[in-house]
From Swiss-Prot:
The gene is UTP23. This is rRNA-processing protein UTP23 homolog. Belongs to the UTP23/FCF1 family. UTP23 subfamily. It comes from Bos taurus. Residues 224-235 have a biased composition (Basic residues). Its main location: nucleus. The lineage of its organism: Eukaryota, Metazoa, Chordata, Craniata, Vertebrata.
Amino acid sequence: MKITRQKHAKKHLGFFRNNFGVREPYQILLDGTFCQAALRGRIQLREQLPRYLMAETQLCTTRCVLKELETLGKDLYGAKLIAQKCQVRNCPHFKNAVSGSECLLSMVEDGNPHHYFLATQDQNLSMKVKKKPGIPLMFIIQNTIVLDKPSPKTIAFVKAVESGQLVSVHEKQSIRQLKEEQGLVKDPEQRRRKKRKKVSGPNPLSCLKKKKKTQDTNSSASEKKRKRKRIRNRSTSKVLSEKQNAEG
């Protein structure tokens, strides 16, 4: 029975590795329901998960899951202790915590780029996860850890990729990486720097204004010179007329 379980797990892992780029160490996101089931079944997750998956694993959770377990009180105190020993992954709900199921679902959005496994006993969450391709799902049944087979949505997605109708998530990531290496995709940080440089640069309009100012000063200076000449002309003519009158 144990050998059959491991054979199935190996087959499913191969499927996710080849089609979605899942790799070791396998990152397994746990919710409160899975931790509670492990506690009741006396399952040592740190020992049994690597043995079952025949690979190195990382047990992970989120702040929202820990907050939810803390809120639920004494009944789930043991589950909370198990979750607290897991690595805490950053979720987008740092300020306002959401339910554990909502949080874990958000962690596998956009094609599950971090290749998380999702471990839960929540049927509602499991159904939502199965509607998204490429997410390995785990649960506990009869005190035994099980890696679920790929969902129909996942299989349909892989078939569509194979027939050329879609590009796989793994290929999308590879294409983006190649574009970044070739400099075809600009890093957002570089864009911000360029924008900042443009703002801090000299404004050509301000240069034009300065030129206009110098022209104005030149014209005003020439007007002053002209005025001075006129004044000098008047004074000499006056002197000449007075001289002529005196002689006459």
